[in-house]
């Protein structure tokens, strides 16, 4: 959530930064500014009334004690004025409450401001490639798409998943299930070694949690809701892990806080009709290891770069070719101030596909979820900066392995770092 004080004091600057996101989208700050002005008028009236009420409370006993009002006319008038002040204060309270709710509702609809270092651009075509890694590991043979080789080997079963659920689900069979488990454990082990504390959070979460990290109210159609219980299926572990600290004041010495978490993730993919209808790239249910950081604002940028490196380290260990892309302002996610996408090479389609999105939200989520920290020896508190990224999406990693590690005989060579987990060197037909 944006800072209303920043909007009030620098409306032109905030408007200009919002406009960097999309020339086609009009983020009108006028209603917020008008409501904010009205709220401050009401607040000023309330303070004046409270001051006068306090004066009356002191004057009445003084008049009684001093005997300066033998007929009690002044005291009577003061009491009547006091009652009027009380009534006026009572009428102000619901007005202030209503306007505050309206302001918050409008603020929740506004995206984060792009970082000044985020490249300007209208859409994904103007994202900037930062680096590539692993060209020497590009396959030398023509390969089948991961869903074809997976079905041939009997480790991916899409047909019966449709029978059990619907499209965009998969059954992992035999070595497919084992490979999924191996990837989860390998990724968690590596990130724990890198200093992340593992969390296994609930995957059913409440509305307040989704609002805190920015998925609600903007993207309600993207998530699965259990309406009878007012709970949602988590779209990413970012939500429950970040909300562990909601309404908390953290001691400054505890920062940075680094968590890794494996969870199933659930997304309706409402806006992706017709996209990636085959394979593991875009499922309603998928597994993911997420990295979440709560950091000091002064170290935010450095911690973001380190987060990207931690995600890259998994792909390097697996020897999967990838590239890092910096998203331009027009392709930036709703809550992100700055974002890098890591894209893995999928040879069957001769393209790179996103496997991790590493975002710096600055204080956007912390302000929504009220996550603050206090530095020793300093007055007051500050909002933390939150960062997160996939470390990695398991299904997409599996799809990259099934394609990049295909052999001419139709088997899959198991990446060396996964062999201790799988207890095998090759995946053949089940």
From Swiss-Prot:
Places the protein is found: Cytoplasm
GO annotation, cellular component aspect: cytoplasm
Binding-site residues for ATP, renumbered to this chain: 267-269, 354-357
One Gene Ontology biological process: selenocysteine biosynthetic process
Keyword Ligase: yes
Biological or metabolic pathway of the protein: Aminoacyl-tRNA biosynthesis; selenocysteinyl-tRNA(Sec) biosynthesis; L-seryl-tRNA(Sec) from L-serine and tRNA(Sec): step 1/1
Enzyme Commission number(s): 6.1.1.11
SUPFAM superfamilies tied to this protein: Class II aaRS and biotin synthetases (SSF55681), tRNA-binding arm (SSF46589)
Record: residues binding L-serine: 236-238, 290, 390
Keyword Zinc-finger included in the entry's annotation: no
UniProtKB keywords: Aminoacyl-tRNA synthetase, ATP-binding, Cytoplasm, Ligase, Nucleotide-binding, Protein biosynthesis
Gene3D superfamilies, per the entry: Bira Bifunctional Protein, Domain 2 (3.30.930.10), Serine-tRNA synthetase, tRNA binding domain (1.10.287.40)
Catalysed reactions listed for this entry: tRNA(Ser) + L-serine + ATP = L-seryl-tRNA(Ser) + AMP + diphosphate + H(+); tRNA(Sec) + L-serine + ATP = L-seryl-tRNA(Sec) + AMP + diphosphate + H(+)
GO molecular function: ATP binding; serine-tRNA ligase activity
Function description: Catalyzes the attachment of serine to tRNA(Ser). Is also able to aminoacylate tRNA(Sec) with serine, to form the misacylated tRNA L-seryl-tRNA(Sec), which will be further converted into selenocysteinyl-tRNA(Sec).
Family: Belongs to the class-II aminoacyl-tRNA synthetase family. Type-1 seryl-tRNA synthetase subfamily.
Oligomeric and partner information: Homodimer. The tRNA molecule binds across the dimer.
Record's protein name: Serine--tRNA ligase
Species per Swiss-Prot/TrEMBL record: Gloeothece citriformis (strain PCC 7424) (Cyanothece sp. (strain PCC 7424))
Organism taxonomic ancestry: Bacteria, Bacillati, Cyanobacteriota, Cyanophyceae, Oscillatoriophycideae
Gene: serS
């Amino acid at each position: 959530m944006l800072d209303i004080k920043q909007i009030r004091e620098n409306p032109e600057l905030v408007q200009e930064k919002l406009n960097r996101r999309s020339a086609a989208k009009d983020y009108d700050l006028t209603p917020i500014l008008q409501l904010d002005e009205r709220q401050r008028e009401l607040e000023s009236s309330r303070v004046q009334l409270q001051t006068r009420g306090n004066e009356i409370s002191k004057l009445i006993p003084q008049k009684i004690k001093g005997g300066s009002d033998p007929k009690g006319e002044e005291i009577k008038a003061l009491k009547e004025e006091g009652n009027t002040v009380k009534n006026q204060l009572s009428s102000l309270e619901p007005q202030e409450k209503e306007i505050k709710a309206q302001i918050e509702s409008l603020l929740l609809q506004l995206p984060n401001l792009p970082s000044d270092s985020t490249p300007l651009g209208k859409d994904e075509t103007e994202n900037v490639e930062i680096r590539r890694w692993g060209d020497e590991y590009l396959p030398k043979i023509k390969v089948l798409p991961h869903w074809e080789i997976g079905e041939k080997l009997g480790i991916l079963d899409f047909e019966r998943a449709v029978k059990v659920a619907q499209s965009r689900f998969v059954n992992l069979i035999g070595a497919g299930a084992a490979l999924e488990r191996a990837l989860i454990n390998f990724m968690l082990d590596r990130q724990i070694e890198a200093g992340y504390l593992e969390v296994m959070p609930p995957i059913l979460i409440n509305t307040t949690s989704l609002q805190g990290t920015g998925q609600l109210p903007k993207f309600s159609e993207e998530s699965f809701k259990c309406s009878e219980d007012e709970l949602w299926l988590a779209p990413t572990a970012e939500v429950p892990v970040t909300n562990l600290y909601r309404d908390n004041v953290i001691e400054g010495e505890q920062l940075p806080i680094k968590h890794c978490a494996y969870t199933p993730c659930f997304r309706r993919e409402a806006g992706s009709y017709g996209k990636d209808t085959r394979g593991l790239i875009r499922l309603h249910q998928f597994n993911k290891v997420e990295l979440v950081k709560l950091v000091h604002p002064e170290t935010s940028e450095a911690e973001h770069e380190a987060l990207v490196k931690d995600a890259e380290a998994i792909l390097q260990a697996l020897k999967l070719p990838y590239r890092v892309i910096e998203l331009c302002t027009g392709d930036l996610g709703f809550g992100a101030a700055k974002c890098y996408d890591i894209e893995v090479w999928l040879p069957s389609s001769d393209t790179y596909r996103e496997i991790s999105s590493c975002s710096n939200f600055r204080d956007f989520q912390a302000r929504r979820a009220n996550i603050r920290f206090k530095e020793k020896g300093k007055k007051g508190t500050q909002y933390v900066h939150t960062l997160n990224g996939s470390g990695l999406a398991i299904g997409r990693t599996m799809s990259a392995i099934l394609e990049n590690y295909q052999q001419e005989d139709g088997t899959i060579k198991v990446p060396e770092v996964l062999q201790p987990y799988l207890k095998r060197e090759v995946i053949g037909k089940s």
